[in-house]
Amino acid sequence: MEKTVLLLATVSLVKSDQICIGYHANNSTEQVDTIMEKNVTVTHAQDILERTHNGKLCDLNGVKPLILRDCSVAGWLLGNPMCDEFINVPEWSYIVEKASPANDLCYPGNFNDYEELKHLLSRINHFEKIQIIPKSSWSNHDASSGVSSACPYLGRSSFFRNVVWLIKKNSAYPTIKRSYNNTNQEDLLVLWGIHHPNDAAEQTKLYQNPTTYISVGTSTLNQRLVPEIATRPKVNGQSGRMEFFWTILKPNDAINFESNGNFIAPEYAYKIVKKGDSTIMKSELEYGNCNTKCQTPMGAINSSMPFHNIHPLTIGECPKYVKSNRLVLATGLRNTPQRERRRKKRGLFGAIAGFIEGGWQGMVDGWYGYHHSNEQGSGYAADKESTQKAIDGVTNKVNSIINKMNTQFEAVGREFNNLERRIENLNKKMEDGFLDVWTYNAELLVLMENERTLDFHDSNVKNLYDKVRLQLRDNAKELGNGCFEFYHKCDNECMESVKNGTYDYPQYSEEARLNREEISGVKLESMGTYQILSIYSTVASSLALAIMVAGLSLWMCSNGSLQCRICI
């Protein structure tokens, strides 16, 4: 009879109504890294590192780039005859120059402070070329014979279009005194130069005067140049050299020139009509007839991701450059949680619902929720409130990362002349160091955010579990796997009240108490039976052992093996 009662009680426990707390799971194989773990499979993840580009040069926000093709910046500004297509250029978004353009300074020489001029151009979007000293105004000097075979055009000798090489006229080179007043409202880029002959004979042949000079002055510039006559190897068929200079002439300022020979005078200057963000990119790409918001020397980027690893030099609304190969942000939950019977903490942030047995693929309309079973059936239901709060918490995670790294180090494509190579090497090391630190910060932040996100989800499951536990109290039993077994009947209406937090504990407490006591009574009665059996077994075993010892002693006494003495 006792066995029958115990069996019925056990069956009734198995079939009791239950409610379980769990979380969403799916077939995702996406993995993320955290501070504590690598390759954690999650239900949802977002790649935040852009790795692709289109391999083309594109318009930037509808404005075409100035692609110099085979011309250099110097060839364009001075007017190399092979760069006539760039005599007048419209507004540009950025400038593209090849690494080694063929049409540079056709007459050999150098451009003074060339790198600084390029840096200036990275803040300019439009030039307007204006004539400041007409070529026809040099009545006392030969302004037409200053050409060279080094600068050919249509098979004939020519020269830079925007400057004039002045030669003696009628065996005389009168001293030049010429001024230009900048009456424009914009700054003016003015260029001029000096010719360094090969020998004294060439000096007098071209300029008559054996000793010459060039003086240039503005409100901020005071320059005096003299030619350096020396024998040099031929470059482009020329033993002479030319050196070019530039300055920015402010509005209402004047530039004064004085020279008695070797002067390369400005004819045109560039009015800076629009300033803005620009850059000079070194690229061999061709124009792709496309539009973009972000351009790199490798191609255009069309992405909403916060980071990229394509090239450190960019222009436009671009993701931030890092050296990383992988940055994946967790937005969902662990998809393969540990299955444990006891609570366990892991991670850095908050409590972990490690006692939950596993995720539910059957729950598709939320991240966290319930599974119930009673006489009316069973089913899954998402907890809308906790799910929505979690969604709100991770929706702005990408923006949060950007805000935390809101000071981007910009790698600027600087150029250095031969005398500044050590500075260039130091600059490259500094840029590499900055990028290394920037990359480390980005990777560390993603790892920490992933750890925080996964712990955040686990904590939400734990909070949902505690919400149910505090409602049910002793009306249900905790099974240790995220489930509760009711001590009373709980129909669908009852289940719904548990889910929405309106469970009426007093309503079910009496039924739960009776069932709980009945189960406890069965256990106690069974325990008493087991105690009686245990005592009986112990006494019987002891008695049998005593009889065996007594019999053995009598046998040994009878055959003389043991002497027995009874003393009274």
Swiss-Prot record:
Gene Ontology CC terms, in alphabetical order: host cell plasma membrane; membrane; viral envelope; virion membrane
BP terms from Gene Ontology: clathrin-dependent endocytosis of virus by host cell; fusion of virus membrane with host endosome membrane; fusion of virus membrane with host plasma membrane; viral budding from plasma membrane; virion attachment to host cell
- Site (Cleavage): which residue positions? 346-347
Localization per Swiss-Prot or TrEMBL:
Virion membrane; Host apical cell membrane
Q: Which residues are glycosylated?
A: 26-27, 39, 181, 302, 500
GO MF annotation list: host cell surface receptor binding
Primary location: virion
Is the keyword Membrane assigned to this protein? yes
Whether Membrane counts among this entry's keywords is yes
**Do you know which Gene3D superfamilies this protein is assigned to?**
3.90.20.10, 3.90.209.20, Hemagglutinin Chain A, Domain 2
Parts of the chain that traverse the membrane: 532-552
List the disulfide bonds in this chain.
20-483, 58-290, 71-83, 106-151, 294-318, 490-494
SUPFAM superfamilies noted in UniProt = Influenza hemagglutinin (stalk), Viral protein domain
Record topology, Cytoplasmic segments: 553-568
UniProt entry keywords in alphabetical sequence:
Clathrin- and caveolin-independent endocytosis of virus by host, Clathrin-mediated endocytosis of virus by host, Disulfide bond, Fusion of virus membrane with host endosomal membrane, Fusion of virus membrane with host membrane, Glycoprotein, Hemagglutinin, Host cell membrane, Host membrane, Host-virus interaction, Lipoprotein, Membrane, Palmitate, Signal, Transmembrane, Transmembrane helix, Viral attachment to host cell, Viral envelope protein, Viral penetration into host cytoplasm, Virion, Virus endocytosis by host, Virus entry into host cell
Q: Which HAMAP family match?
A: INFV_HEMA
What does the miscellaneous comment read? Answer: Major glycoprotein, comprises over 80% of the envelope proteins present in virus particle.
The entry sums up its family as follows:
Belongs to the influenza viruses hemagglutinin family.
Function noted in UniProt: Binds to sialic acid-containing receptors on the cell surface, bringing about the attachment of the virus particle to the cell. This attachment induces virion internalization of about two third of the virus particles through clathrin-dependent endocytosis and about one third through a clathrin- and caveolin-independent pathway. Plays a major role in the determination of host range restriction and virulence. Class I viral fusion protein.
Name of the protein this chain belongs to: Hemagglutinin
Provide the species name.
Influenza A virus (strain A/Hong Kong/156/1997 H5N1 genotype Gs/Gd)
